[in-house]
Amino acid sequence: MPPAKTLREAYNTANPTEPLPPDDERYVNCTDVRGDEDTVSQMFRTISYSDAHTHQLFTGHRGCGKSTELLRLQQRLEGDGFYVVYFAVDEDLDPNDLIYTDLLLSIARRVVAQTSEDEINLGDALNVVEKWFAEVVYEEGEWEKVEQELKNEAEIGLGLPKGLPFIARVLTRLTGQIKTGDEVKKKIRQRLDNRIPQLISGLNDLLNRADVEVQRAGRKAVAVIVDNLDRVTYKDLGDGHTSHDALFIENGGQLCALRCHTIYTVPISMMYGLSARNLDGIFARCHVLPMIKSHRPRTQGGGEEPGGMDRLRDIIRRRIDADALCEPEAVEYFCRACGGHPRDLMTLVRQSIEYADDKEPRPVTLAAARRAEARLISAFSRMIPEPYYEKLVAVYQTNKIKKDADHQAMLFSQSVLEYANGTEPWHDVHPAVQKLKSFQEELNRSRVIEG
């Protein structure tokens, strides 16, 4: 795909939420400017070298490029003979209200649907799971009604493609009800919560049968990759207990009980405090995808990082003909204003196109770039509580964060970004946050006190 030469083309190719397919020409390898950790190769080797099933976590700020890297991992695993089930969890479930039983249901749905579409016969395991759901999830008389409704939908071609096993329709209905219905969601969760061992056993029966069938076809094993779990909303449930802890720590054992290789994305905020230590005891490995280093730590003299800035320019130029559409000053402004965050970089480019001046030979002007940045600054201003600014200034001055709930929340909201310098991570305040009036006032206040 050649770089876009019109504003319309540029607007669409700069879509900040679209992960790139593995062989997309727009892909820019940023491994060396993220800290020299090749996360895709590490996750691949963990799976391909291990005789036992592995359960790994993958994290990084939302929008840093995790989905693109996971799609590359999927391609590499499939090329090595693995059967990969990849899906984004928010396509099935609501990240604002998601618990581990919901996730297990979603994995079951995806495994059943994909194996059926690929003509991998799971045989009697499907019937056993279907019978179990009929007995456990539905009350007497409910199942017959649901069964008839789903059969009618299948006959007239509603919903899933024809030919999928009946249990695929059952699981699709259940995940859909959990995503959209409050009362029925509570009922389903209550009934499943009392039967977790049986739910996992049934899912493992499906995975065991899938393993047998894919190996019979000459492949190695099943691997499940669950993307976008890092979008699960952070909720303080009291007593230092959060929604993230509930999913990945308190019930992490259940997520690791599946008889297949698994990779789950996880919020980057969980890499600090007690959460990190607890995760290390549950999952085999947690891989971090840091920001692109657009600058050096302030504690080491600061200044731009030439390699990182070059790579950010490459990301823009692979997508759009910047020489034809952008003022050079605008391109530089985008790269500095994003803080090395790929999605924010694309967001700034796309929003600046909305402010482009058609009268100019290069319509994406520096003025348009500044207006786009103003929208990002405004978004942060509505998000950050006033008590956080003193702590944000401390992060700005030290390039370090504390391992407490407030700093975890800053990482989750991306008001603080994580970078890597070899094996040692460092942190900085997002450039847009640095321009907020409240931040500048607190920074000036701290300098007066120090002076």
What is each PLM-predicted segment?
Residues 192, 204-328:
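The catalytic "switch" region of P-loop NTPases
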Residues 1-77, 81-83:
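Walker A/P-loop-proximal flanking segment of P-loop NTPase domains
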Residues 2, 363-451:
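C-terminal leucine-rich, beta-strand-based interaction scaffolds used for sensing/assembly
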